[in-house]
Structures are given as C-alpha cells and as structure tokens.
Amino acid sequence: MTETKNEIRVAKNHKDRLFRMIFREKKELLSLYNAVNGTSYTNAEDLEIVTLENAIYMNMKNDLAFIMDSYLNLYEHQSTYSPNMPLRDLFYIAKELQGQVNHRDLYRNTLIKIPTPRFLVFYNLSLIHI
C-alpha cells in the first residue's frame, strides 16, 4: 500500500486475495450465493467448489467457481473495469467444462448435461480518497 497526500492506493492483488480468502469456505460462499440470488439455502455441503487454480492452459485462474442448484457460478472480483471480462469468463467456463466432461462422451449419441453458467463480477474502486 502506498500513500500520498490525500489518497491511499491498495495493491489490486491484495483485494483479490482478500475476496478469495473470505469466500473460500463453503459457509461464507453459500451466504454470498444466497445474498446475490435472493435464496435461503442452508446446507453448505450442497456447494461443489470448482475454482480454477493456475490451470496449465493459459495460466488461467479465477476467483470463485462453484456448482449450486445445477448452475455453474463464476464470481470474479475486480478493482477496475475490464471490457474483456465476458471473454475471460467464457475461457473459464470452457476450461472448467473440459475437466468435468469425459472427452470420449463428446462423440456419443447421448446429450451431455452441463450446469448452466452464471457470471458475476464484483467491482470496487482502485483509489480511495480521504
């Protein structure tokens, strides 16, 4: 963190790490899910955490990814706006589904059911004026 006359700058990756740290436990993640979706689920074990951590392909990593109620939820925390977040989310979902689907099943005649993806980005300011 650096400080100037009237402002404090916080390292972007520190905020990102804090977001992941707070919601890495299923109980807290379920609470966030309920707040975002207006639901009242109580069993945190219904969550299946599937967050990508430094996947080999493109060195991708996302903040939070989990399956709940047949939805694949990808939650990202950003300190600045990025118009490329939808594309990044597409890459994340593709990489996650590659891991969940047996490659041989792609060539069979039966439909492979996948969870419906939901993307959510939490933004905050990168500069705090005091």
Identify what each model region corresponds to.
Residues M1-I128:
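Accessory alpha/beta interaction modules
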